[in-house]
């Protein structure tokens, strides 16, 4: 089915207000969920909203909490999210990293005691729109087996890197081949995954999203490489924030909350003039996309460039929402 941005935001806002969230906070949170969905990231927008409400009702998310600065070391700051609303706090933390970068050339904010930030790419994009390189990542509850194991012991720990090119170039990727949100998107659409995304119950690689969702044997991105990246990203976020690791979140908490996150902004214009920056970026993009195609019907993609197209399409034609997901939201 198709809905408008206004319908989507109003539905989110209604549910948040009914759960006791104050009107200003509810409006800002609903706006972010609707923008994420409008950008085509359904897995961490509309599809994730019922799960967000569940955690709100369970007390994992404290809607009136505000992040608190703990330590300031020039270009580096450490904050405590105090289990505030994840997407609103993440936006504030990247804004703070940008402010630090304006003063120092680079800004790093390490955040502990945080909640799920929904679409991580929003915060990298936020920096790139202002002309900064944006880098951020988060740890999570253990939802992926380390390479060579059957049991979940590491997080998908998504990493975002956004570059202020025209259009913005951005990688937004979990350390698994697919996020659990994308497994859900493909399952709801009745599609197999385009490549193997995990193991079935017999230990064979599979493209069936429902099987992987159920047994949680999701495949690390690049096999042992994604497994290793997940571990070191967790270690850095834990140390810099003095926060909880994947092990602590998984073993000590009843659900995924109290996680650790990193936000970095770099002011490119302190290192290179604008015309030179643009020319260098354009040469990279032209060089990549001019390669001979393996399939003439498949264009060579640059990461993140599809979001500009998806956003325009959704604004023109309406936002596609799965019927079952919309029914869940209407019932909340």
UniProtKB/Swiss-Prot annotation:
PANTHER family, A to Z: 2,3-DIKETO-L-GULONATE REDUCTASE, OXIDOREDUCTASE-RELATED
Active-site residue numbers: 44
Superkingdom assignment: Bacteria
Protein name: 2,3-diketo-L-gulonate reductase
EC top class, as a word: oxidoreductase
Assembly mode: Homodimer.
Localization annotation: Cytoplasm
Binding site for NAD(+): 168-174, 224-225, 304-306
Family: Belongs to the LDH2/MDH2 oxidoreductase family. DlgD subfamily.
Disulfide bonds: none
Its EC number(s): 1.1.1.130
Function: Catalyzes the reduction of 2,3-diketo-L-gulonate in the presence of NADH, to form 3-keto-L-gulonate.
Any one Gene Ontology cellular component term annotated for this protein: cytoplasm
Keyword list, A-Z: Cytoplasm, NAD, Oxidoreductase
Reaction(s) this enzyme catalyzes, per UniProt: 3-dehydro-L-gulonate + NAD(+) = 2,3-dioxo-L-gulonate + NADH + H(+); 3-dehydro-L-gulonate + NADP(+) = 2,3-dioxo-L-gulonate + NADPH + H(+)
Species of provenance: Escherichia coli O127:H6 (strain E2348/69 / EPEC)
Listed GO MF terms: 3-dehydro-L-gulonate 2-dehydrogenase activity; NAD+ binding
């Amino acid at each position: 089915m198709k809905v408008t941005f206004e319908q989507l935001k109003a539905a989110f806002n209604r549910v948040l207000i009914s759960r006791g969230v104050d009107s200003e906070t509810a409006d800002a949170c609903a706006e972010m969920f609707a923008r994420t969905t409008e950008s085509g990231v359904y897995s961490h927008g509309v599809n994730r909203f019922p799960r967000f409400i569940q955690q709100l009702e369970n007390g994992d998310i404290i809607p009136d909490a505000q992040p608190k600065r703990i330590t300031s070391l020039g270009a580096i700051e450490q904050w405590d999210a105090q289990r505030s609303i994840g997407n609103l706090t993440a936006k504030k933390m990247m804004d703070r990293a940008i402010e630090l970068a304006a003063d120092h050339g680079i800004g790093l904010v390490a955040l502990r005691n945080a909640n799920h930030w929904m679409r991580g790419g929003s915060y990298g994009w936020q920096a790139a729109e202002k002309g900064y390189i944006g880098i951020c990542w988060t740890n999570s509850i253990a939802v992926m087996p380390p390479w060579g194991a059957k049991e979940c012991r590491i997080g998908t720990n998504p990493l975002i890197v956004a570059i202020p090119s025209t259009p913005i170039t951005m990688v937004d990727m979990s350390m698994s081949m697919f996020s659990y949100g994308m497994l859900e998107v493909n399952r709801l659409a009745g599609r197999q995954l385009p490549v193997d995304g995990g193991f079935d119950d017999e230990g064979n690689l599979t493209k069936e999203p429902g099987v992987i969702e159920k047994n949680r044997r999701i495949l690390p991105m690049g096999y042992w490489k994604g497994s290793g990246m997940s571990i070191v990203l967790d270690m850095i976020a834990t140390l810099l924030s003095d926060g909880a690791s994947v092990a602590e979140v998984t073993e000590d908490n009843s659900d995924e909350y109290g996680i650790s996150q990193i936000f970095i902004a770099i002011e490119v214009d302190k290192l290179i003039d604008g015309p030179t920056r643009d020319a260098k970026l354009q040469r990279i993009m032209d060089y990549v996309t001019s390669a001979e195609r393996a399939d003439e019907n498949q264009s060579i993609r640059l990461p993140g460039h599809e979001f500009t197209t998806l956003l325009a399409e959704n604004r023109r034609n309406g936002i596609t929402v799965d019927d079952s997901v919309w029914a869940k939201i209407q019932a909340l």
